[in-house]
């Protein structure tokens, strides 16, 4: 199996780094695309259009977070079966995961499209950007089936330790997205509709690339005969692994929506500042997220092989990698935050100075707390990979409570400065839960293994 990577053998640090690097590069590429997309929208359509795209970002985090989290959860039993070398069982999980994901895709797409405008009203979307925000969000909801398809199939590939191919697919999809942005927005002049259509088509393209690759190179994943049968127990385990992970993102998303709703009430300038800062923040924080994703596969395979000591060694290695990266971000963000934010606005705009100053402040405050975020992602994904998604979901509840508290009490007093502390307070709250939770899970697994 030349297209797979057994993470139960070899040096843990090397395995984690080799798996995480393509993920990190892929997501950085995605975030660069999102930054380019926001820059195109902000500079060529206007600050109002940038705010319209950003006004729905927290909603998309909730919806897409549920989709992506669920798909990541569905891949955990597959990674564990692969680690245990039980390939027939692995393929049966693949067949049942496809069924569950199809149902989720249809239900979510129908419901979100029907309630699109009502959702925007709930988050206090300013009236002057409501129409553009509605058009963009509706197109994003139509993208849900393709997003689920890509994340599910890419999750299957990563469960086998192969993170390179999904990275290549992200490169292709991101390049297509940028080309479509230029064509639809700058050439044809479609406005925010062009940005939405470009995203939809590029997601479809990435899903098709996964299908072709699996059929050609990873036939070990393709179910045959009785492996295709519906199995209640497997569906139950998939739901038990996937739904809590999906809900974790959605619960976290509720807190982010509360925070964005409080920020939206401050006015269009602050919506634009929040949008610009979040775009760049995700560019830097996706590294932490993908170290965590690597840990989920690493822990999943090693639990399947019952090599529990490798899990502790892997977590320690991941923390050291995270701290080294944090030092790098400090050297970039602290001195250059203002310059990065200037890419999103037309300097001739009367509001450009306020947008840049507030967005840069958001970036610097968040940067101080990146080690807290890094520990959060490492422990959360490790717990998920070890098969305890319910506990990781509870950390999302802690984040939600923290962000809601900031939205209700801190933002009214300190305005945008309060918004800047929404994420750090949430990260600290989650870590206070995850540290003892990880210790509990590891000790429980050791006890059962003995």
Name what the model sees in each region.
Residues 1-20, 78-143, 187-243, 299-368, ...:
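Short alpha-helical transmembrane segments in multi-pass integral membrane proteins
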Residues 7-44, 58-73, 77, 102-109, ...:
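N-terminal transmembrane alpha-helices
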Residues 71, 139-158, 166-174, 195-208, ...:
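Short runs within selected transmembrane alpha-helices of multi-pass transporters and secretion channels
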Residues 41-61, 127-132, 192-193, 234-241, ...:
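Interfacial/gating helices of multi-pass transporter permease domains
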Residues 62-65, 109, 177-182, 207-211, ...:
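Hydrophobic transmembrane alpha-helices of multi-pass small-molecule transporters
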Residues 32-50, 120-127, 183-190, 250-283, ...:
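Helix-terminus/linker motif at the lipid-water interface of multi-pass membrane proteins
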Residues 50-110, 147-166, 273-337, 373-395:
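Small-residue-rich hydrophobic transmembrane alpha-helices
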Residues 18-37, 139, 173, 202-206, ...:
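Transmembrane helical elements of multi-pass membrane transporters/channels
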């Amino acid at each position: 199996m030349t297209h797979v990577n057994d993470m139960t053998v070899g040096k843990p640090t090397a395995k984690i780094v080799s798996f995480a690097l393509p993920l990190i590069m892929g997501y950085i590429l995605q975030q660069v695309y999102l930054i380019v997309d926001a820059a195109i929208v902000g500079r060529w359509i206007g600050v109002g259009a940038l705010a319209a795209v950003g006004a729905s970002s927290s909603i998309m985090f909730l919806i897409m977070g549920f989709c992506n989290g669920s798909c990541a959860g569905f891949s955990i039993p597959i990674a564990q079966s692969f680690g245990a070398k039980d390939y027939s069982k692995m393929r049966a999980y693949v067949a049942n995961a496809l069924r569950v994901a199809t149902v989720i895709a249809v239900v979510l797409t129908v419901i979100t499209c029907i309630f699109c405008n009502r959702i925007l009203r709930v988050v206090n979307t300013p009236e002057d950007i409501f129409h553009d925000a509605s058009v963009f969000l509706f197109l994003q909801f139509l993208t849900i089936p393709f997003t689920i398809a890509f994340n599910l199939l890419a999750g299957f590939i990563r469960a086998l330790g192969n993170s390179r191919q999904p990275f290549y697919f992200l490169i292709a999809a991101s390049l297509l997205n940028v080309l479509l942005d230029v064509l639809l927005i700058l050439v044809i002049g479609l406005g925010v509709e062009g940005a939405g259509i470009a995203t939809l088509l590029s997601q479809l393209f990435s899903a098709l690339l996964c299908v072709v690759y699996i059929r050609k190179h990873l036939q070990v994943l393709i179910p045959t005969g009785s492996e295709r049968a519906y199995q209640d127990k497997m569906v139950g385990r998939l739901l038990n692994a996937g739904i809590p992970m999906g809900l974790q993102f959605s619960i976290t998303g509720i807190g982010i929506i509360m925070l964005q709703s409080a920020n939206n009430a401050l006015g269009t300038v602050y919506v634009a500042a929040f949008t610009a800062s979040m775009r760049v923040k995700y560019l830097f924080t996706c590294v932490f997220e993908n170290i965590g994703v690597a840990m989920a596969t690493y822990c999943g395979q090693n639990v399947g092989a019952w090599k529990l000591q490798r899990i502790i060694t892997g977590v320690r290695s991941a923390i050291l990698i995270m701290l080294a990266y944090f030092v790098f971000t400090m050297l970039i963000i602290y001195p250059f935050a203002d310059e990065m934010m200037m890419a999103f606005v037309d300097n001739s705009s009367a509001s450009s100075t306020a947008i840049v100053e507030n967005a840069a402040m958001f970036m610097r405050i968040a940067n101080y707390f990146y080690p807290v975020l890094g520990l959060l992602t490492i422990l959360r994904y490790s717990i998920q990979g070890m098969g305890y998604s319910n506990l990781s979901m509870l950390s999302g509840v802690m984040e939600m409570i923290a962000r809601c508290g900031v939205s209700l009490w801190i933002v009214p007093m300190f305005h945008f400065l309060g918004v800047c502390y929404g994420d750090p307070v949430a990260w600290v709250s989650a870590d206070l839960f995850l540290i003892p939770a990880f210790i509990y899970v590891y000790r429980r697994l050791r006890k059962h293994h003995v």
